[in-house]
């Protein structure tokens, strides 16, 4: 994913990369693509997209209600301000993470980050595009 141009709405994706991935999906006989993300509880969750809609979903992402991030590890919806079922964020895929799933017929997956419609962090979950965010895990404090 590349950054969006000033004044545009949302992040932009290289059209050639999208075409290449759609062609790869057809070549690999993929019919469903799982858009995976990790919620604040550390649980991997996702939404599936049919290959017929893959190009548009790779470009614009997949909609996700903010309330999905208020579901705990027991699948209970926790009442948290700002994580109501009204208001949507986007699951924006990292095209380099495309993986054909060998244990599921005709299925692939792609890892996503959660962003607002404008491509910026939406507040509850910081994406890798966050300014000043370290890409390394913090070292544990020495005892």
Task: Enumerate the predicted regions with their spans.
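ATP/Mg2+-dependent ligation/transfer catalytic cores
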Residues: 1-143
């Amino acid at each position: 994913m590349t950054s969006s141009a000033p004044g545009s709405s949302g992040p932009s994706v290289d059209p050639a990369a999208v075409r290449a991935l759609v062609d790869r999906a057809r070549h690999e006989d993929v019919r469903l693509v799982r858009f995976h993300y990790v919620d604040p509880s550390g649980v991997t969750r996702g939404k599936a997209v049919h290959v017929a809609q893959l190009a548009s979903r790779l470009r614009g992402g997949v909609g996700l209600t903010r309330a999905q991030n208020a579901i705990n590890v027991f699948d209970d919806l926790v009442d948290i301000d700002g994580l109501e079922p009204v208001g949507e964020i986007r699951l924006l895929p990292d095209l380099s993470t495309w993986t054909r799933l060998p244990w599921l017929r005709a299925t692939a997956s792609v890892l996503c980050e959660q962003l607002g419609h404008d491509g910026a962090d939406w507040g509850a979950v910081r994406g890798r595009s966050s300014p000043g965010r370290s890409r390394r895990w913090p070292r544990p404090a020495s005892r």
